[in-house]
Amino acid sequence: VRRSASATTARCLSNPGRFLAGCDGAGSRTRRQLDIGLDETDLRKLVVRELGLPRTVATLARAFRETRERPADGRFYLVHFTTPDAEILNRFGGVWHVQSPAGWTVISQNDGDTFTLHAPLGMGTDADRIDPREFVHARLGRRFEMDVLVANAWTPRLTVADSFGRGRVWLAGDAVHQVTPTGGYGMNTGVGDAVGLGWALAGVLQGWGTPGLLRAYEQERRSVALRNRRTAARHSLVRAAVMATNRAELHSERWLGARTRRRIGREISDLGNLENEALGIELGYRYDTSPAVCHESGGQAPRQTMDEYTPSTWPGARPPSVLLADGRALFDLFRRGFTLLRFADHDVTAFVGAAAERGVPLDVVDVRDTRARALYERDLVVVRPDQHVAWRGDTPPGDPLHVIDRIRGAHHGTRRSDQEKS
């Protein structure tokens, strides 16, 4: 688009391609063109169901009575700003998140001068008439110098698309899932989508991968999106429970205020800090039903919980991060294609030959490190380009072509293990 004093000129470009990746956000036109629906969890109904209608109504009524704040309608208002008076926001020491029982949160974006405030909006509030500076000052309780970078209303959503694409058009990121910011899963899930879709498209375009990789992408990433939506909803409920504890006497300097703060502090502590400590969600997700992974028929898969991460090379998992004895990170040894990690002396000539026969990029990386071998659990581990485990074993596979075909998307719908094949 070119603008001048007298005219605006637009030039449309057409770029043909074999595939289209729709990464066009929550209002994705690509998704709508494909007529793909969204499965949505209504956050307000969820809060009422989990906290109970009487408690929810009592909380809203008390907030209005004590502060004359209108009951929240589900929207939030964000103000992204910089300030030279950062010490005002760090008066109790440097923190990343400051969360108020009133429902607002201040986030330190750079451990310096940049912050974001998110605060609920009351029913009937016209967001276009809000003065961002006054909005911030009213919630933080004092005035200070600030430069507003961005300010707008937004509505938290908990949605997952019914499909992640089809044929030559596939979707990723907010186009297929939107979650509340609680836990920070939105962008992180989208990055995982980009990696998952990227290597699948590369495989198909380079000729060694089949369209089955794209179907596997949907199965793998949609399961993660559903899991992260459930977890983000759980964290939002904790926030709602904290808001339900809010009382005007929290701010009293008298003995009742101190007593109330101690009691509510215990209640908040009992709710836990899983929103910031859910390592099982952040690191421990697996593609347990993927058609592009060689699953195991025996053994016990590591237990999956929100708060615990168990390092493992169980097929479909992300392999553990290990620093080798010489100081190198094992992840830095992974290749752009598939990586066959060899922790012991095994002849993998047939395995490498099978990959070459199918045109699959497979590099052998020898690792002689006792600690790494213990964490990786097998003598041989194949890691996919997206750094998920595709196959593992203590001996080379009896039918290497079967393994190679499966991890390139040429087998669909079964969970046939290599142990069964051999």
Each PLM stretch: what is its role?
Residues L43, V48, L53, A138, ...:
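Helical substrate-recognition/capping region of FAD-dependent monooxygenase/halogenase enzymes
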Residues V1-R259, V365, D418:
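Core Rossmann-like FAD-binding/catalytic domain of the broad FAD-dependent monooxygenase superfamily
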